[in-house]
From Swiss-Prot:
Pfam families for the chain: Asp-Al_Ex, TrkA_C
Taxonomic placement: Bacteria, Pseudomonadati, Pseudomonadota, Gammaproteobacteria, Enterobacterales
Superkingdom as given in the UniProt entry: Bacteria
Main localization category: membrane
Keyword Repeat: yes
Annotated HAMAP family: YbjL
Family annotation (PROSITE patterns): RCK_C
Domain RCK C-terminal: 200-288, 292-373
CC per GO annotation: plasma membrane
Protein name (Swiss-Prot/TrEMBL): Putative transport protein YbjL
Family statement drawn from the similarity comment of this UniProt entry: Belongs to the AAE transporter (TC 2.A.81) family. YbjL subfamily.
BP terms from Gene Ontology: potassium ion transport
Length: 561
């Protein structure tokens, strides 16, 4: 039996789509030195090559892909989006505006200089900034721009062509810039990280190991009684001195949970909870030969929960003000916008931050109720909320504003982005509403993006040879300029106008570019995870601004060139 592969693929859109995705994802795993191509560019390259062979796909698949992607971007940004606007994140907001705004202006100027149409210009902006949200926003606005069919088709083809030609330029140039730009300014990143660590009492270790607390039981001997000197547990402040706290006491065969007025006596058996290194640091005379095994005394359920910050008595407060250890709980991690933050007593908590807390189940539940709520450990997505807000986003995108003879609408991209932000924000405030496991959200977002990239590549592939020969050199120059010049402008603005600490500034710059590989280089250079504070500060708002930039560039200059 003979199988005509070309006819088989052209006759089955679903098969073609998944062949492109499979081949593209394989290609995306290839590395050029230390740089991995990535899924987006892999799928785009494969789809462009197959597009040259006149394979095509139903445009409905492309539309659904970009809608899912942009909606999920909004959901991820939602918990921290408003806190960046309305509280102490004005520096991060201004940095993101400078980065995106300068890139937008430079791209428009270069597009005018080289005589490109709006499709090439917007695609070059998206690729140089390694930002798929720009591509998505521009593509959606073009489709709703009222262009005649042939002109629209050319603009969309050029959009994906510009993106494909400049994506690697933008990625490589930013990674190289992240490696060498810190060396061109007079403040060493490692010194800057240590400086802010001293000022704020931060943990600078980028590779800090996380241990769970353990429970051990000891019999109180004369050495420990002498050390307490008749003081009660409250006066001793035993956790501050040892890193452990007393969970239970057995005295005369009676098991009890001690209060602050309890005084240790000879022969008491105590259950100490603390990290392994805290147990190891205990005075040997307190523990050597005195450890006991008592099933009831040691019968404590240590749990680790992810606590979402929500309540007003925690939002805006420093970690130190929560006094977790006074409540018998241990902090393992602080997560903001999927970025792990330094464990720092002076880190100010935002609504939607996630604290990984360990301790006795009852104590963790108590502290969680005071801070916010325990994140649901479920693999079940609230599809009702997901679909309802998706519909709301589409309806918002249909709104059109009319001014005399000029009209414009938000479009699906802006509508879905706004609806996603609202869903993410409400999820951060209501633990049982709109729950989407992070794995499920990431999968839908990635799948939507890959479908979108496959669609634009197949649509644009037929014209890539002509375009590459005519504008390849110009695209190389423009891509480098748009990738690096806004970074330099952002650095000058942050360093000399905002006067930011350099470690935080470089982290914030990488967040404004939403580039995780470059962020890793900055952290390695600083030998610290301090830059993650800046990265998390700009990342959420930058994703939103980049989507709007794709819309704005088309609305401002629809006939560029």
């Amino acid at each position: 039996m003979n199988i005509n592969v070309a006819e088989l693929l052209n006759g089955n859109y679903i098969l073609l789509l998944f062949v492109v995705l499979a081949l593209g994802l394989c290609l995306g795993k290839l590395r050029l030195g230390s740089i991995q191509l990535g899924n987006s560019i892999g799928v785009l390259v494969v789809s462009l090559l197959l597009g040259q062979q006149h394979f095509s796909i139903n445009t409905d698949a492309l539309n659904l892909g970009f809608m899912l992607f942009i909606f999920c971007v909004g959901v991820e940004a939602g918990p921290n989006f408003f806190s960046i606007f309305f509280r102490d994140g004005k520096n991060y907001l201004m940095l993101a505006l400078v980065m995106v705004g300068s890139a937008l202006v430079i791209a428009l100027g270069l597009g005018k200089l080289f005589g490109w149409d709006i499709g090439l210009t917007a695609g070059m902006l998206a690729g140089s900034m390694t930002s798929t949200p720009v591509l998505v926003g521009a593509g959606d606005t073009l489709r709703h721009s009222g262009m005649e069919s042939r002109q629209l088709s050319l603009a969309l083809d050029n959009l994906s062509l510009g993106y494909a030609l400049t994506y690697l330029i933008g990625l490589v140039s930013l990674i190289v810039g992240a490696r060498y730009l810190p060396k061109l300014q007079h403040q060493d990143l490692q010194t800057s990280a240590q400086q802010i660590a001293r000022e704020r009492g931060l943990d600078t270790d980028a590779n800090r190991k996380v241990y769970l607390p353990v429970i051990r039981a000891y019999r109180v001997g004369p050495e420990l009684v002498a050390w307490t000197d008749g003081k009660n547990l409250r006066e001793l402040g035993i956790y501050r001195q040892t890193g452990c706290y007393i969970e239970r006491i057995r005295r005369n065969g009676i098991l009890a949970n001690p209060d602050g007025d309890a005084v240790l006596q000879m022969g008491d058996e105590i259950a100490l909870v603390g990290y392994p290194d805290a147990h190891a640091r205990l005075d040997p005379s307190f523990r050597n030969g005195k450890e006991v095994f008592d099933r009831d005394l040691l019968d404590m359920r240590i749990v680790t929960e992810e606590v979402v910050v929500k309540n007003h008595n925690a939002v805006g407060k420093c970690l130190a003000q929560l006094k977790l250890t006074d409540h018998g709980c241990f902090l393992n991690r602080v997560i903001r916008s999927q970025i792990e933050m330094p464990i720092d007593d002076n880190v100010v908590l935002n609504k939607g931050d996630v604290l990984q807390v360990s301790g006795d189940a009852r104590r963790v539940k108590t502290i969680a109720d005071r801070i916010g709520f325990i994140s649901i450990h479920s693999q079940v997505t609230d599809l009702l909320a997901f679909c309802a807000f998706f519909v709301i986003g589409l309806m918002i995108g249909m709104i059109t504003f009319q001014f005399s003879t000029f009209s414009f609408g938000m479009g699906n991209a802006a509508g879905l982005l706004f609806a996603g932000i609202m869903l993410g924000f409400m999820r951060a405030n209501h633990p049982t509403f709109g729950y989407i496991p992070q794995g499920a959200l990431s999968m839908v977002k990635e799948f939507g993006l890959m479908v979108f990239m496959a669609g634009v590549g197949l649509s644009a592939g037929s014209g890539i040879n002509n375009g590459l020969g005519a504008i390849g050199g110009q695209m190389l120059i423009a891509g480098l300029i748009v990738s690096l010049v806004p970074v330099v402008i952002c650095f000058l603005f942050g360093a000399y106008v905002l006067r930011m600490n350099r470690a935080l500034l470089f982290g914030a710059m990488m967040g404004a570019r939403t580039c995780a590989p470059a962020m890793e280089i900055i952290s390695d250079t600083a030998r610290s995870n301090i830059p993650a504070l800046g990265y998390a500060g700009t990342y959420a708002i930058a994703n939103v601004l980049l989507t709007l930039a794709g819309t704005i560039i088309v609305m401002v200059c629809p006939g560029l060139g």
